[in-house]
Swiss-Prot record:
Function: Pore-forming subunit of a potassium efflux system that confers protection against electrophiles. Catalyzes K(+)/H(+) antiport.
Gene encoding the protein: kefB
Occurrences of domain RCK N-terminal (ranges): 400-519
Molecular-function GO terms, alphabetical: glutathione-regulated potassium exporter activity
Protein name per Swiss-Prot or TrEMBL: Glutathione-regulated potassium-efflux system protein KefB
Pfam families on file: Na_H_Exchanger, TrkA_N
Source species of the chain: Salmonella paratyphi C (strain RKS4594)
Keyword Transmembrane: yes
Subcellular location: Cell inner membrane
Subunit field text: Interacts with the regulatory subunit KefG.
InterPro entries: Cation/H_exchanger_TM, K/H_exchanger, K_H_efflux_KefB, K_uptake_TrkA, Na+/solute_symporter_sf, NAD(P)-bd_dom_sf, RCK_N
Protein keywords: Antiport, Cell inner membrane, Cell membrane, Ion transport, Membrane, Potassium, Potassium transport, Transmembrane, Transmembrane helix, Transport
Example of a GO biological process term: proton transmembrane transport
Residue spans crossing the bilayer: 4-24, 29-49, 55-75, 87-107, 111-131, 152-172, 177-197, 207-227, 230-250, 262-282, 284-304, 324-344, 356-376
Length: 601
């Protein structure tokens, strides 16, 4: 693709995203489906603005690559080891069972047995990009079903390697003398990457961070991700797997959050490009000529994968209310099918329109998932939020609440219990199905739903409520909800949970002054007790705690413009020295005053 054509394609992609995604959100069908429809519109079978789909699709895989790097940052090696049973147990069972059933059906549809095996394996895979995106949107990533879903996706990425190696063997074109030397060199190169990354990455990023230039840090992060992807691609392995490993190696480093912040904007944009490219690849000509075959294939594919996943979730012990979400979010075909089927086609395994039919089936199955998840959400909302079957009076009246509490994790539970103990009328919203079921057993009136949806807030009583307390786990959800309330319910008094200083800065910039850093108050209290244990009078320790809180908050406000810049490091050091000096002067003055308390703890 020439430079001018590339620029034109970029403009078209951005225009399609800007036009389609807000429209999709307004229609309530989700951003992912909006991207897919935008791709169909501008692709060769739509308006025909872009015709070179294969090249763009390969480039757009970088969105999946960046996503897997961020996921790797969220998992340390010990956590990955804890997931080994679900990865190699449930993940392997899903791929093998689904592939076997689908391959059998393809043989009944006049596919050669070799082509049926490849087709079954390809269709058994799910879309990593779509599933992870939907799991984040639905709040599944921290639930048991979300963890199991991630394990299945990770095994599927690992299965890419043997699946690609199987194609030439099935085609009968494999060398009689297998080149073990090449295999050994690939294994050696992979080992070098692991060992080198384990011992070199942190010193390298420490050196780069010392420069204090954020742009260089961002460039180094991009270099790491793209190099890992290129290296794995050269070895014939999954690019996404390479960047995932790089993320895991840096998961325990002090630069984890900075790395995530540097990558996040690129990840979102490239993921959108990936979904648009998938939509562009939909061959409407094949769809028109084989409409019944394709429609039946999509339904059969989704149903078989859902049944398999539901059965495995039940055997694994997932709660019944979470099984449908787990089965639905992984029910589509995936991006790996494009690679596997292209490889099989080059080996002449497919006949006639067989490859085109399979690719159309995969693409359409991806379009069904957002709609399926939306339908299941409505069903779960009706099931969980409907009238109680028993006559027990709920703790919380849901009509005209004074306060809406968003999130009912450990943080939100403390707040809700305090409010209920003081006879406040509250409505609690939670999107973790397991938490909703568990808390309802204890008598709490908790409602299932995504609070970032305006209609849900309105039905929860936001127009009549006085305050909203936001205790979301994800900072992105918190900021989205803040903006939503400020736009649609400006009368609400917003109180929010901040996980750390960065989130506190973002809340202050958004105009939210009432927030609590989740570990700050408890850390201060433990610090006060430590001072008392070292011999300080409780009165002085209490005053020291109050001084520290006030001065730290002042410095927090002063650093607002610099919270996203590496300059904050040097300013924070200066602020710490200033804090110590002011604190020392005030405490010296305090010691000259009479003690207010006489009793020690």
């Amino acid at each position: 693709m020439e430079g001018a054509d590339l620029l034109t394609a970029g403009v078209l992609f951005l225009f399609a995203a800007v036009a389609a995604v807000p429209l999709a959100a307004r229609l309530g069908i989700g951003a992912v489906l909006g991207y897919l429809l935008a791709g169909i519109a501008i692709g060769p079978w739509g308006l025909g603005f872009i015709s070179d789909v294969d090249e763009i699709l390969h480039f757009s895989e970088l969105g999946v690559v960046f996503l897997m790097f961020i996921i790797g940052l969220e998992l340390n090696p010990s956590r990955l080891w804890q997931l080994r049973r679900s990865i190699f147990g449930v993940g392997a069972a899903q791929v093998l069972l689904s592939a076997a059933v689908l391959a059998g059906l393809l043989m009944l549809a006049d596919f050669l047995w070799q082509a049926a095996v490849v087709g079954g394996i390809g269709l058994a895979m799910s879309s990593t990009a779509m599933a992870l995106q939907l799991m984040r949107e639905k709040g599944m990533n921290r639930s048991e079903s979300g963890q199991l879903g991630f394990s299945v996706l990770l095994f599927q990425d690992l299965a890419v390697i043997p699946a690609l190696a199987l194609v030439p063997l099935l085609a009968g074109s494999a060398d009689e003398h297998f080149d073990w030397f090449k295999v050994a060199m690939k294994v050696l190169a992979f080992a070098v990457m692991l060992i080198g990354g384990r011992y070199l990455l942190r010193p390298v990023f420490r050196f780069i961070a010392a420069s204090g230039v954020r742009e260089v840090f961002t460039a180094a992060t991009l270099l790491l991700v793209l190099s890992a992807a290129l290296f794995m691609d050269a070895l014939g392995l999954s690019m996404a797997l390479g960047t995932f490993i790089a993320g895991v190696l840096l998961a325990e480093s002090e630069y984890r959050h900075e790395l995530e912040n540097a990558i996040d904007p690129f990840k979102g944009l490239l993921l959108g490009l990936f979904f648009i490219s998938v939509g562009m690849s939909l061959n409407l000509g094949v769809l028109y000529t084989h409409l019944l075959w394709v429609a039946a294939s999509v339904v059969i594919l989704v149903v078989i994968k859902m049944l398999t996943l539901y059965l495995l979730a039940r055997l694994y012990g997932i709660r019944s209310s979470e099984r449908m979400q787990f089965a639905s979010v992984l029910s589509q075909g995936g991006e790996f099918a494009f690679v596997l089927f292209s490889t099989a086609s080059s080996q002449r395994l497919f006949q006639g329109d067989q490859m085109a039919l399979l690719l159309v089936t995969v693409t359409l199955s991806m379009m069904t998932t957002p709609l399926l998840m939306k339908g299941i959400d409505k069903w779960l909302s009706h099931r969980l939020n409907g009238p109680e079957e028993n006559d027990e009076k709920p703790w919380v009246e849901d009509d005209k609440p004074q306060v809406i509490v968003v999130g009912f994790g450990r943080f939100g539970q403390v707040i809700a219990r305090l409010l209920m103990a003081n006879k406040m009328r509250i409505t609690v919203l939670e999107r973790d199905i397991g938490a909703v079921n568990l808390m309802r057993k204890y008598g709490y009136k908790v409602y299932y739903g995504d609070a970032t949806q305006v209609e849900l807030l309105r039905s929860a009583g936001a127009e009549a409520a006085e305050s909203i307390v936001i205790t979301c786990n994800e900072p992105e959800d918190t900021m989205k909800l803040v903006a939503l309330c400020q736009q649609h319910f400006p009368h609400l008094h917003i109180l929010a949970r901040a996980r750390g200083r960065v989130e506190a800065h973002e809340l202050l910039q958004a105009g939210v002054t009432q927030f609590s850093r989740e570990t700050f108050s408890s850390a201060l209290e433990l610090g006060r007790k430590t001072l008392v244990s070292l011999g300080m009078h409780p009165h002085q320790a209490q005053r020291a705690q109050l001084h520290f809180r006030r001065l730290d908050m002042r410095i927090l406000r002063e650093l607002i413009p610099e919270h996203s810049d590496m300059v904050q490091i040097s300013r924070a050091r200066e602020a710490r020295r200033e804090l110590e000096e002011i604190f020392q002067r005030e405490m010296q003055q305090e010691r000259r005053q009479l003690d207010g308390w006489d009793e020690f703890e």
